[in-house]
Amino acid sequence: MKKIYLEVKVVANNEVRNVAFAKGINRAINLGNVEKILAMMKVKGYRKAEMVQVVKAEDVITTGDIRLVDINGQDINPEDAAKYFLVLDGQHRTIAASLYNEWAAENGEEAINVPAIEVEL
C-alpha cells in the first residue's frame, strides 16, 4: 500500500507557510466532506474567495498548552513554529487542496496554494 505524504502551502498577507493543526482542538476530518471538496476542485479549481482562517503558529505555541501537528500528524517543535500557519477554520479545504496537489502532479495540472486570511486571537 502506498503511503501518502500530504503537503500544501497556505498564503496569508503574501506570506507562504506550511499547515498546522491544533491536536485535540481542530475538529476531526470528515473524509466524505474532503472527497466532495476535492471533486469540486478537480472541476472548478480552488475558489479563491473561500479563504481559510489562520494565525501564526508561533503566536499560539508559546504558552505550551496547545500541541501543534503538521498536515501528516507529526508534532511541530516550538523552534519550527514560525514555518507554519495554524488553521482555525478550513481544515477540510486544506486537506482537499493537498490531495488536489497530489492529483495535479500526476495529471500535469498546476498545484495550488491555499488562500488564507490571518485573524487575531
Regions found by a protein language model. Name each.
Residues 1-88, 92-101, 105, 119:
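Short alpha-helix boundary/capping and kink motifs at helix termini
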Residues 107-121:
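Charge-dense polyanion-binding interfaces
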